[in-house]
Swiss-Prot record:
Record has Cytoplasm as a keyword: no
Database matches in PANTHER family: PHOSPHO-N-ACETYLMURAMOYL-PENTAPEPTIDE-TRANSFERASE (PTHR22926), PHOSPHO-N-ACETYLMURAMOYL-PENTAPEPTIDE-TRANSFERASE HOMOLOG (PTHR22926:SF5)
Domain of life the protein comes from: Bacteria
Membrane topology qualifier: Multi-pass membrane protein
Organism: Chlorobium luteolum (strain DSM 273 / BCRC 81028 / 2530)
EC numbers for this chain: 2.7.8.13
Gene Ontology BP term (one): peptidoglycan biosynthetic process
Pathway assigned in UniProt: Cell wall biogenesis; peptidoglycan biosynthesis
Transferase as UniProt keyword: yes
Enzyme class: transferase
Protein family: Belongs to the glycosyltransferase 4 family. MraY subfamily.
Protein name: Phospho-N-acetylmuramoyl-pentapeptide-transferase
Catalyzed reaction equations: UDP-N-acetyl-alpha-D-muramoyl-L-alanyl-gamma-D-glutamyl-meso-2,6-diaminopimeloyl-D-alanyl-D-alanine + di-trans,octa-cis-undecaprenyl phosphate = di-trans,octa-cis-undecaprenyl diphospho-N-acetyl-alpha-D-muramoyl-L-alanyl-D-glutamyl-meso-2,6-diaminopimeloyl-D-alanyl-D-alanine + UMP
Single GO molecular function: UDP-N-acetylmuramoyl-L-alanyl-D-glutamyl-meso-2,6-diaminopimelyl-D-alanyl-D-alanine:undecaprenyl-phosphate transferase activity
Length: 368
């Protein structure tokens, strides 16, 4: 919106210095600053409002340290989503299909998360929205993204193909499996970030690092020269995704101002499902979804810890008559909590691991 206004003045009157608005790096930086300022300035009032209405219920089986947070407000994801949407509308070419497809994913799963949080907090429905309906929403979003990118010429014939990390000019053609792959990745990532959101700042900080990396890949993929040099798929117009990524990064960082230990607010499913779906759609659009097991490694480990715990418990119960556990508690961060690790130490160590995964992902650009 603001971009189009400044673009009009620049092309009509050509005032000195206004041409900078045409640079992708300027608009990405402006979106980042705008998103951060909105979150920081709106945060205190938003927290006061939520504290008077929406208090996060804490499970009785949660670690003792976690049960102390029973009086904190949830649904903080609304603040993240608002900051992202406003920043993107102001500084991106929001008629670009890449942009609004990501924004659709953020809003779509944000609404699903809000319904889940509302049912838990206000309606006092144990468990909130049933897993079945969450899955229906995730599959529906995957269908929309998959079908639209398959049919819209703006996404070209490359959408059914993807690059393979560590291999130069090697691609995989999904063919008829493209839409199921899209559904799986969106479902897996949104659930993975949701599972990770269990400690102060863990999900927001980790998401910021992952999306920052994806923003770098998007910038490179949107430039034909860089894409050719690095042997990654060239995505026409994909550079606009970098603007969206920076808005998401700084909205998450701004939220971290209030969500770091000791937290003043939780993002709830409203934020975690929205961020997870955004990560998935961005990776799909820039053809780096096969890099997600590395880049989003922390989210993968958290999800695997839950899956392994459940499967092992069921197996041992069937084999020995009594279920046994590998971890003290799943997801993985709660295991370390029960081992006596301080919450801040767990979060910072997980951030460090995420940064290591980020750097490993960058190495794949040259290790081909």
């Amino acid at each position: 919106m603001l971009y189009y206004l400044l673009h009009y003045f620049n092309s009509t009157y050509n005032p000195p210095g206004l041409g900078v608005v045409e640079y992708l790096t300027f608009r990405a930086s402006a979106a980042a600053i705008t998103s951060l300022l909105i979150t920081l300035l709106a945060g205190p009032g938003f927290i006061r409002y939520l504290r008077s209405r929406f208090i996060e219920p804490v499970k009785e089986e949660a670690p003792a340290e976690h049960r102390k947070k029973k009086d904190l407000p949830t649904m903080g994801g609304l603040l993240i989503i608002f900051s992202i949407e406003v920043s993107v509308l102001l500084w991106s070419k929001f008629d670009d299909p890449h942009v609004w497809l990501i924004m659709l994913a953020v809003l779509w799963m944000g609404v699903v998360g809000f319904i889940d949080d509302y049912r838990k907090v206000v309606l006092k429905v144990k468990g909130g929205l049933s897993p079945r309906w969450k899955l229906v929403a995730q599959v529906a979003l995957g269908l929309v993204v998959g079908i639209y990118t398959s049919l819209d010429p703006a996404f070209s014939v490359l959408m059914r193909e993807t690059s393979v990390p560590f291999f130069k000019n090697l691609t995989i053609d999904y063919g008829y499996f493209y839409i199921p792959v899209v559904i799986f990745i969106i479902t897996a990532l949104s659930n993975a970030v949701n599972l990770t959101d269990g400690l102060d700042g863990l999900a927001s900080g980790s998401s910021a690092i992952v999306v920052f990396a994806l923003g770098g890949f998007a910038y490179l993929a949107g430039n034909a020269v860089y894409a050719t040099y690095l042997s990654i798929p060239f995505i026409p117009g994909g550079g606009e995704i970098a603007v969206v990524c920076m808005a998401i990064v700084m909205a998450s960082v701004g939220f971290l101002w209030f969500n770091s230990n000791p937290a003043e607010i939780f993002m709830g499913d409203t934020g975690s499902l929205a961020l997870g779906s955004a990560i998935a759609v961005i990776a799909l659009l820039i053809k780096q979804e096969l890099l997600l097991p590395v880049l989003a490694g922390v989210f993968l480990l958290e999800t695997l810890s839950v899956s392994v715990q459940v499967l092992y418990f069921k197996y041992t119960r069937m084999r020995f008559g009594q279920g046994r556990r590998i971890f003290l508690m799943a997801p993985l961060h709660h295991h370390f909590q029960l081992k006596g690790w301080a919450e801040q130490k767990i979060v910072i160590r997980f951030w460090i691991i995420t940064i290591l995964f980020f750097l490993t992902s960058l190495m794949t650009l040259k290790l081909r």
